[in-house]
């Protein structure tokens, strides 16, 4: 039963987060998604998005207005990792989800693209999901519950890290393990 539950979670987590956003009238945002936009999402990108902006300057949305963010292959192009994670947390509602994919430093993909200016791997997310690591960056406000952080290896020795995180903004009891 546990194995099947895990399989179903991996298959449907993002769809369930999207449905929850719809039910609660929260936005669904695709950061940097103008090349391959996710259906039903508003795109925030440098050009050709629903909202065009420089993500290095922040996310131009109200606090707590977003239910789910898709951030596929974008955060490595943002100069300040702490700022973009802080902005993602700011715009997400309590219990809002972010689904991140980023080239990992465990492979060549993080280094080969000249537009990459920040570098990530599975451990990079600990500073926002684990209290003992958050202390190293004086992080007392950005809190995420970690549901999935893993790395897969693709062709040409390109490793991709996925992080599925849920924003914590209240002391509400939550399912699953919480380390922050």
Protein language model annotation of sequence segments:
Residues 70:
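A conserved beta-strand element that flanks and buttresses the S-adenosyl-L-methionine
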Residues 6-26:
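Conserved alpha-helix/loop element of class I SAM-dependent methyltransferases that forms part
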Residues 35-62:
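Adenosine-cofactor binding site in Rossmann-like domains, unifying the SAM/SAH pocket
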Residues 28, 41, 98-100:
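Hydrophobic/aromatic residues located in beta-strands of well-ordered beta-sheets
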Residues 74:
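Hydrophobic adenine-recognition pocket in adenosine-nucleotide-binding enzymes
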Residues 79-83, 87, 93, 97-180:
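S-adenosyl-L-methionine-dependent methyltransferase catalytic module, highlighting the catalytic core
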Residues 26-32:
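Conserved class I S-adenosyl-L-methionine
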């Amino acid at each position: 039963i546990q194995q099947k539950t895990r399989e179903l979670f991996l298959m449907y987590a993002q769809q369930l987060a999207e449905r929850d956003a719809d039910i609660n009238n929260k936005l669904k945002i695709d950061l940097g998604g103008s090349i391959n936009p996710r259906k039903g999402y508003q795109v925030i990108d440098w050009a050709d998005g629903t909202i065009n902006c420089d993500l290095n300057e922040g996310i131009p949305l109200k606090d707590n207005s977003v239910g789910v963010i898709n951030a596929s292959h974008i955060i490595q192009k943002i100069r300040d990792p702490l700022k973009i994670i802080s902005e993602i947390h700011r715009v997400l509602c309590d219990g809002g989800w972010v689904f991140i994919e980023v080239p990992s430093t465990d492979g060549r993909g993080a280094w080969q693209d000249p537009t990459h200016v920040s570098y990530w791997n599975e451990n990079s997310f600990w500073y926002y999901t684990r209290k003992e690591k958050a202390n190293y960056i004086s992080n007392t406000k950005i809190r995420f519950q970690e549901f999935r952080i893993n790395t897969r290896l693709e062709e040409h020795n390109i490793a991709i890290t996925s992080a599925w995180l849920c924003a914590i903004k209240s002391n509400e009891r939550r399912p699953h393990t919480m380390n922050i």
